[in-house]
């Protein structure tokens, strides 16, 4: 394992730079897309996920209930914060592992759910 780590760190870094750029684009797309539909989330600095509070108008729901709502009504899966311990309650996590077109589609679907609560 140590030899593999050395090879990865000392070898060509082209893939690493491409991966970092890909995740940065996805992060920026989701952060700005959610802001555009009224859900302002903090911009993470170095992760492939976004951790954020549930929108205020859904505060009556647990993180699991909100995640279930998004899954059932929008077909979008997020991780409920409660799965990360008691301090995660009230939050959800978006994984930035899908390609940009699917992330755009997910934001459009989430927008419909947020509008339902108005």
Task: Set out the residue ranges of the language-model regions.
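PLP-dependent class I/II
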Residues: 1-118
């Amino acid at each position: 394992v140590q030899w593999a780590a050395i090879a990865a760190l000392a070898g060509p870094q082209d893939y690493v730079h491409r991966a970092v750029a890909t995740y940065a684009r996805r992060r920026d797309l989701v952060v700005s897309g959610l802001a555009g539909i009224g859900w302002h989330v903090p911009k993470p600095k170095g992760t492939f996920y976004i951790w954020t509070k549930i929108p205020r108008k859904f505060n009556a729901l647990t993180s699991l209930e909100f995640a279930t709502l998004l899954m059932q009504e929008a077909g979008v899966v997020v991780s409920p914060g409660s799965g990360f311990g008691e301090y995660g309650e009230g939050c959800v996590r978006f994984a930035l592992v899908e390609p940009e077109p699917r992330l755009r589609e997910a934001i459009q679907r989430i927008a419909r759910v947020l509008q339902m609560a108005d």
